[in-house]
């Protein structure tokens, strides 16, 4: 949480994207501390620099954040399945490519399941992160906040009650859902292959690069 605060406070006009691959308690702690140590004006300034991309919602802290900080740009994407390749693809094109590939772990659950949260911010000419309705490798989102987008089922099973914070508002996936990512599957993986090739290519001109 201290790192988040330090990163937001840097003299940098760019927004800070929080890619949430798990629970949101760390960001919640950062926001709580800032709220209890700064003026309302400075809290608003802090929040204005933050952007959140939450994969699936994996605890109840996201609902608490959305409820207590309604000015925060908060995306929760629950349409993130179906785009990764199979295990054989990752073995052939990643794990067998040089020293870096060797440390790429075999999956236990979903391969690259949370990756859309940072793929969304890759500057590939398709999207503009500040325009969530444009679409790109990380998906496309509604410009209208949706009410009470719930977390994964296991959050309820672990007796975490998001509805205590209802109503809370977040940006959610557009009507096309997971297809907004799935249509870019080949492009995402071609880019991944190229980057792996860079790790074993000594000369820049001998590898494939973007125009």
Give the positions of each predicted feature:
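N-terminal acidic, glycine/proline-rich low-complexity segments
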Residues: 1-210
């Amino acid at each position: 949480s201290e790192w988040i605060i330090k990163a937001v406070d840097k003299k940098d006009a760019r927004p800070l994207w929080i890619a949430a691959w798990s629970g949101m308690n760390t960001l919640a702690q950062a926001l709580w501390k800032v709220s209890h140590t700064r003026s309302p004006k400075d809290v608003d300034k802090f929040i204005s620099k933050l952007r959140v991309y939450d994969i699936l919602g994996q605890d109840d802290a996201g609902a608490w954040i959305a409820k207590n900080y309604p000015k925060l740009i908060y995306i929760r994407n629950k349409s993130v399945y179906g785009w990764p390749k199979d295990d054989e693809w990752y073995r052939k094109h990643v794990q067998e490519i040089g020293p870096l590939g060797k440390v790429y772990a075999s999956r236990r659950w979903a391969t690259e399941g949370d990756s859309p949260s940072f793929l969304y911010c890759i500057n590939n000419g398709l999207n503009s992160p500040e325009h969530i309705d444009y679409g790109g490798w990380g998906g496309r989102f509604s410009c209208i906040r949706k009410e009470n987008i719930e977390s994964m089922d296991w959050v309820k099973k672990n007796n975490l009650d998001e509805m205590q914070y209802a109503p809370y508002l977040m940006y959610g996936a557009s009507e096309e859902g997971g297809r907004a990512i799935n249509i870019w599957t080949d492009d995402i993986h071609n880019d991944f292959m190229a980057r792996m090739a860079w790790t074993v290519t000594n000369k820049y001109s001998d590898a494939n690069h973007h125009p």
